[in-house]
């Protein structure tokens, strides 16, 4: 409030809101703030991160840059509370950090249920320091450990063109074609997504690790992502 008048901006910084409903604030939202400041008639009150259809104060997002350092691999893992996905990904960070010269970063999202709720693990790896303080929305690799999510969440829309999608399921190729939403299949085809399926539960039982599908899926991630030799 003290700086704005001295720069001739009047009350342009009057009131702003962000992070409502636990929504993440991304670089694209920050860019929209600067675009607003450069506008002929900037909004003095605005909302970031959500589509504010109550007050209609949201700023338009016109670009969504990838601000992670070049060479960074960004990965998202969709799991179910207590299924071992989060624990396996925490182990993955430690394994990569201890056995490579790469930097590693992990964020973990949980819903209000401690068991049986959705979890999303956000992992980044790369040769440069990683300072991104927001969740991943441009992923090189996305894994869905619970097949019921394919009709509930837009998971593949976060995958960059040429990226990879791993789905844990029991479906045959014919069943898979019926189970996947048309929107998901279209995005995979149009963006040349590398699509893999695995029956982690069956493999875990076959190798004597019943109930440890997360370990099988972790191995699949290391194999497909080729971050460290398996």
List each model region and its residues.
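Alpha-helix C-terminal capping/helix-to-coil transition sites in glycosyltransferase folds
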Residues: 8, 137-139, 161
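Short alpha-helices
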Residues: 14-36, 179-230
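Anionic-ligand anchoring segments at beta-strand to alpha-helix junctions in alpha/beta enzyme folds, i.e.
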Residues: 71-142
């Amino acid at each position: 409030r003290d700086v704005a008048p001295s720069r001739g901006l009047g009350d342009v910084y009057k009131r702003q809101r962000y992070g409502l409903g636990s929504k993440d604030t991304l670089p694209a939202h920050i860019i929209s703030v600067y675009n607003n400041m450069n506008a002929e008639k900037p909004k003095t009150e605005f909302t970031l991160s959500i589509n504010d259809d109550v007050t209609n104060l949201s700023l338009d997002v016109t670009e969504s840059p990838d601000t992670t350092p070049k060479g960074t691999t960004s990965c998202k893992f969709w799991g179910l509370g207590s299924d071992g996905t989060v624990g396996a990904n925490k182990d993955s960070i430690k394994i990569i950090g201890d056995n490579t010269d790469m930097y590693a970063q992990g964020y973990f999202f949980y819903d209000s249920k401690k068991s049986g709720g959705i979890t999303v693990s956000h992992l980044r790896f790369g040769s440069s320091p990683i300072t991104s303080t927001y969740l991943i929305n441009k992923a090189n690799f996305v894994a869905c450990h619970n097949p019921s999510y394919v009709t509930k969440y837009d998971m593949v829309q976060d995958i960059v063109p040429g990226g990879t999608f791993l789905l844990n399921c029991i479906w045959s190729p014919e069943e898979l074609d019926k189970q996947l939403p048309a929107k998901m299949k279209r995005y995979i085809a149009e963006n040349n997504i590398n699509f893999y399926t695995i029956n982690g539960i069956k493999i875990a039982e076959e190798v004597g690790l019943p109930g440890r599908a997360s370990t099988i899926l972790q191995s699949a991630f290391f194999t497909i992502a080729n971050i460290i030799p398996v």
